């Protein structure tokens, strides 16, 4: 996560300078900052009309096991192994991590630390452009087929309502940005590896974007984009993301681990499990969420007409 003591503009790589988490704003924070370098909302498939822009609402999606089946970094590692960037022993390590992630449905701190060390050692001395190009290729070969259809429909629902849709993930920024771009989303906040003159140094900028770090990132993004967090929605599979889920007006547990499922039931959060209900993902999105997004779109349209 890129953290500084001020709010700045995205740099040339598209990274966002985030406010310091030392003094976070209240959950309904908003600001007059205008969006910078933001793609236009994506219209519904088959439509030539842009949806009305809903400037104060957004949706935040975790990636691993929420949007993507399993770990996006492991899928990336598989693609690199196929290109002989890694040894057979490394491939077995990736497969073991993937199997454990799918079996337990939750992250392990030791796995996260070990993965970080290996990833930083791998990218040190390599160009950012090379990693971005590899990410594009591996997305097409592996990751595209791992997107949960139900979660993809949810992202489109928010886009159709004219809302921003962001990926908030521990996944390396370059890969997260590729996924967001391919799905037509607004953008991504991910773990940032330091680079100098387009070459990775093998060090992180800040820490892995994980747990409370995601909540700090979302708060800062809300200030930057003028969002009202009470009107925003967050999606995750992991109990580790409770700080982020607790910030917004609507929290949704997607393919939740046991602890998140229990908490979601306790707090009355929506639960969607596409692992055991793949057909339901094709039938439609939750009615309450759909109505909320549609209501936001209508409100934005009414506001636009009144201003004319």
Swiss-Prot record:
One of its GO terms (cellular component) is plasma membrane. Mg(2+) binds at residues 62, 64, 237. NCBIfam families: HAD-SF-IB, HAD-SF-IB-hyp1. One of its GO terms (molecular function) is L-phosphoserine phosphatase activity. It is found in: Cell membrane. InterPro entries: HAD-like_SerB, HAD-like_sf, HAD_hydro_SerB1, HAD_sf. Belongs to the HAD-like hydrolase superfamily. SerB family. Keywords: Cell membrane, Hydrolase, Magnesium, Membrane, Metal-binding, Transmembrane, Transmembrane helix. This is Phosphoserine phosphatase SerB1. It catalyses: O-phospho-L-serine + H2O = L-serine + phosphate; O-phospho-D-serine + H2O = D-serine + phosphate. Likely catalyzes the dephosphorylation of O-phospho-L-serine into L-serine. Residues 1-48 are annotated as: Disordered. Its EC number is 3.1.3.3. The active site is at 62 (nucleophile), 64 (proton donor). Disruption phenotype: Transposon mutagenesis experiments have identified that SerB2 is essential for the pathogen's viability while SerB1 is not. Substrate binds at residues 90, 126, 169-170, 214, 240. Its cofactor is Mg(2+). Binds 1 Mg(2+) ion per subunit. SUPFAM superfamilies: HAD-like (SSF56784).
């Amino acid at each position: 996560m890129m953290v500084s003591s001020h709010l700045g503009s995205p740099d040339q790589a598209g990274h966002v300078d985030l406010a310091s988490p030392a003094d976070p704003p209240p959950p309904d924070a908003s600001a007059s900052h205008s969006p910078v370098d933001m793609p236009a909302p994506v219209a519904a498939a088959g439509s030539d009309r842009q949806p009305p822009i809903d400037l104060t609402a957004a949706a935040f999606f975790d990636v691993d096991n929420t949007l993507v089946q399993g770990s996006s970094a492991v899928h990336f590692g598989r693609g690199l192994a196929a290109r002989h960037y890694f040894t057979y022993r490394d491939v077995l390590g990736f497969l073991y991590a993937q199997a454990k992630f799918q079996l337990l449905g939750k992250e392990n701190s030791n796995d996260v630390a070990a993965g970080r060390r290996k990833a930083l050692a791998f990218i040190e001395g390599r160009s950012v452009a090379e990693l971005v190009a590899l990410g594009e290729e591996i997305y097409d070969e592996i990751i595209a087929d791992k997107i949960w259809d139900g979660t993809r429909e949810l992202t489109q629902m928010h886009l159709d309502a004219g809302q921003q849709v962001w990926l908030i993930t521990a996944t390396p920024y370059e890969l997260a940005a590729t996924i967001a771009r391919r799905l037509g989303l607004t953008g991504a906040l991910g773990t940032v590896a330091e680079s100098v003159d387009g070459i990775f140094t093998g060090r992180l900028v800040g820490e892995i974007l994980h747990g409370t770090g995601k909540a700090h990132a979302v708060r800062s993004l809300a200030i930057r984009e003028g969002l009202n967090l009470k009107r925003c929605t967050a999606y995750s599979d992991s109990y580790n993301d409770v700080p982020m889920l607790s910030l917004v007006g609507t929290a949704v547990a997607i393919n939740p681990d046991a602890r998140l499922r229990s908490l979601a039931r306790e707090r009355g959060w929506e639960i969607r499990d596409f692992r055991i209900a793949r057909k339901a993902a094709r039938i439609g999105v939750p009615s309450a969420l759909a109505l909320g997004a549609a209501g936001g779109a209508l409100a934005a349209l009414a506001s636009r007409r009144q201003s004319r």
